Every structure is written in C-alpha cells, then in structure tokens.
Amino acid sequence: MGVQSRKRSYFLTLMLACSGWISAQQGVLIEAESFTEKGGWLVDPQFVEQMGSPYLLAHGMGVPVANAATKVSLPVEGNYRVWARTKNWAPGNWAAPGRFRVLVEGDTLPNVLGIHPDWNWEYAGEISVNKAVVAVALADLTGFEGRCDALYFTNSRETPPASGSDLAGWRKSKLQEPLAPEITQTFDLVVVGGGIAGCAAAIAAAEQGLQVALIHDRPVLGGNASSEIRVHTLGIYGKFERILSKIDTEHYPNGSPDAILDQQKRDENVKRYPNIHLFLNWRAFHAASQDNLVQFVDARPTSGGESIRFKAPLFLDSTGDGWIGYWSGAEYSYGRESVYQYGEAWEQWGELWSPEEPDNAVMGSSILWRTKIANTGKAFPAVPWAMEVAQSHEATAGEWYWEFSRNDLHQIEDGETIRDHMLKAIYGSFYNAKQNPANANYQLEWVSYLLGKRESRRLIGDHIFTFRDVLDGAAFADSVVMEVREIDVHFQQQLQDERQPDFLSKALFYKTGKYYIPYRSLYSRNINNLFMAGRNFSCSHVGLGGPRVMRTTGQMGAAVGYAASLCKKYGVGPREIYTQHLKEYMDLIERQQWNRP
C-alpha cells in the first residue's frame, strides 16, 4: 500500500471512529406532562408562555402525592446523567417546599430536586442502563407544589439550556417537532377559550349551523365558573337566557363543591351539539395574521402530542388574557387609564378608583379554598416558607377578597409568582389557624391551583366601553349586552391600612341603573376577522368593573355567535355586520329573548 493510500485509510478510520463517538453522545428529553401515569401530580399549563411548557405539579395540600410514572426508551446502553427542569418556588432560609426525587427502575437517584430558585436544570444523578426501556417515576416528598417540567437523560457532559429562545429551540430539536403543525383543520369559527363566554358563543354559532372548533386548555369547561376554580356566575341573562341557563351556575358560596353539578350540566349541554368540535386539554400557542386578518391558530394537547393548525374565516378570542389578539397584532390596553382619558372619576374614592396618571395596577387574581371539620384532630405541617406572606393572619377558608395585585407585577407575565404568593397566603394562614386548639379538627378539603383572574389585556374594538357609558345609561343602536349590576373595582386593603395582609382586597361598588354594551366592543378595530368576548373585550379598566361577571360575558359570547352566523351568510367580517347588516343582526338578537329555555 502506498503512502497516499495509507493516509486515506487512516483518515477514514479516524472519521468513522469520530462518527461513532458522536452518535454515541445521545440525549433523550421527556416532557413531564407526557408521563403515562400522572399519579397524584397535575398538569399545569397556566404559564407556558413564560416558562416554556406545561409541567407536572404535586398539589397535595401538604400530603405527598402518588408517584407519576412512565417508560423511557434509551438509544444505547451505558451510563446516563439525569437532569430535571424544576424550580424552588419559595426560596429562603428553610427547606424548599416542593422537593421531589427521580426514580429509575425503582432505584432512587441521589439528589433531592426542586431546591434552586428560578426555572433551571437540576442534576438528579447518574444511572447505568443495560436495557432499552427503563421505568421512571417522580416521587413527591412534601405535597407542597413540587413541580417538574421535563427530564433529560444524556450520556455526555452537556447541560441543557436554561430558558428563553435557546431552550425553546433545543426542546423543539430534541422532540423532533416540525417547524409548523403538519395537520390542518378548517372550521367556520374557531373559538379559543372555553369559559362561559366561549361556550355561549360556540352554542349560538352551532345552533345557526356553523362548524365550530372550541379550544380549551382544561379538562372541563367554564373557566372561572368551572369545578376547578368554583366562582358562581353573576349578572343577568339579557336576551340569552335559553343559552346561558345551559352553562351558568347556581348561586352557591364561592369555592363550593356544588360547582361540580353545574360542571356536569355545562359539559353535557355543550357536547350535545355535533357541530361543536371540542378540543379539551388543548392549548393555543401561536396565531398569525396577514393583511389584518388572522390566518390560523396553532394548538397542541397539554399532555404532549401532535399539534394542529386551525383555520377559519372567523376567530373568537375568549382566552381572558387576549392571547389570540396579542399574537396576531391586535391593539390592546393593560392597566388603569388616567382619570382624564375617559372622564371616569368618582371623587369620593379618588386614586383608588381612577388615578391621575396611568399605571399598571389592575384587579387581581384569586385562589379559592375551603376546609372541612373531621372527626379527629390532624396536625398541619409547619410552613416557614409561607410566613413571610401570611405573617400572623389566621383563616380556615377563603373568599373572593383573597386577591393579589401589585403595580410592579403583571397579571400574565408574573402569573406564576402571583399564584405562588396566594398559595403561601393560604397555607400560612391555615397553619396559623391550626395553632388554636379550637381548630384542631379542621383539615384542608380543597385548594385550587388555578388562578381566577379578573383583568389583564383588554383588546380594543371600534367602541371602548367606559364608565361614562354606564353613567349615561343610554342604549346604542347596536346594544347586544345589558346589565344592571353595580360597577365594582377592587384594590388591595394595604393601600388603606398597612397593617392588612397584602393578599386581601376591597371592592368599591358604584350603584347604577341598567347599562348597555354595543356590538362594536366585541370585535377588534384592526384585526378584521377577530371577535372578542369575556374580560378581554373592548373596555377601560373602570368600564370592566361591572360587565366582567360571567352571565354578562356569556351575553357577549352569545352575541358574537349570532354575528358569526351572519358573517358566514354574507361572506363579510365582523365590522360589516354593524355597517351593512345591523337591522338583520339586531332582529336576530331580539328574537332570542322570546326563545325561552
């Protein structure tokens, strides 16, 4: 063999060796929400846009939950380093409250997880694998909100990226996800958000013959009225009693298990419509517009799986947070306007009602909870990590005024911080109450882990509903929603009395007569095929104070559903219903009040 041939052979051997080494450096990413057995862990998709993914939450109210488990296929035998993406949600000079461990083939990995602040990868330990498929489990150690986003098995020394676009791209690569959904489905109307407003819109449109996609990121419908959050519905039916009575609630105490019966009624009634295509446990993650028209909404299952691109000539944003509008470039507002912008003063309450200068303060979010009285006493563990919030406050139940908002916190971007703050308030206040012997037999029965939001983004329509509209009390030519409920705006009690906990609010009630909301507040002024209904409708901060309750937002949804039917009939957008077909639309709305349940 000549020198040149020997060199070629040497380099070929070296390249093959390197190729083999590279192929052996392999990693497997397992999304925790995709575990086949969730055990007592819950899928929490509330904060995907901030931290990157749904995650598993060990919401045991102080009692460790059953293990989550799955099978993991590994590409080669050998040693693997195991990482978990997690977070210590209450860092401080105490043991982290959400601690857990990873088990592989029944063996507990050495490192306790959930101990470092902020979302990041924590090293669980190293394993030796001599089989293609291994059993993996998450073992909760506390019952206090441990959380796991994902596990990563790697036979290299790499550390996965922590957050942001680097993590998103890395995650997409590891999961081999396509750049865009490979499945497309087309409907007459796509409704994103299955609260009372979204359900009412879907029913109204379906009854008019439209094919409707209803996308909702929870296993049950109703939003704040669902059995998962348990707020009763307030407001009047307006002209839509037949539809709204199918999906509303009795006036049970907030947090009551009676919400479960109303949940069953709601789910059954929506599922009766064959042309409502229900996508429960699906979360929208992207929308795009072109020429001021929403082109599509992309959504995926909250427990993992193939995504779908939803197309339609019409879309309804009833997400509460205005996500479809936000992604597609719709104009929106957030926070409190200056008192001078719309003339919304209530002199008696000054800055607490409407500020001199605009700010980021909004009505806050709540977490409802309840206790039961058992036959025997049961201790509740010490929660030192909660006491900085609860301080000396004692309670054995929560109500609507357990609410948190702060000018430096954004109700969407800081949602997880706000939720966790409320959990600290609950656990700490209950611990304090348990120190009283009279409360020895009290036990936590139910604590929601889902934020009940009141206010965040408000999409802007052709008409912005304000306090002035309430004071005027005049009907519009396109009045489709009516209400008699007082305008109530919330503020934190600490603003009046520094001795009060920061998680309790107070409401200011402005008594009023009947007022009306025009159809023009229910479609975007710059995205020409986008409706909105619910608390993200077109209004000012004070204007939201009355009609944010759920029978009223349900009226909005029903009005949108009927408008969508005429949009289809004439091949026009939402605005043209007002400019070209208003009489026919209002006649259709008017007929609904005589169509009793």
State what each model feature region is.
Residues 205:
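Aromatic pocket-lining residues of Rossmann-like dinucleotide-binding sites
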Residues 183-195:
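Beta1/beta-strand and adjacent pyrophosphate-binding region of the FAD-binding site
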Residues 210-211, 216-288, 333, 361-369:
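Conserved N-terminal/central alpha/beta ligand/cofactor-binding core
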Residues 176-183, 224, 285, 293-296, ...:
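Flavin (FAD/FMN)-binding glycine-rich loop and adjacent Rossmann-like elements that form
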Residues 198:
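N-terminal Rossmann-fold NAD(P) dinucleotide-binding loop
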Residues 1-25:
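Bacterial Sec-dependent N-terminal signal peptides
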Residues 25-182:
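Extracytoplasmic
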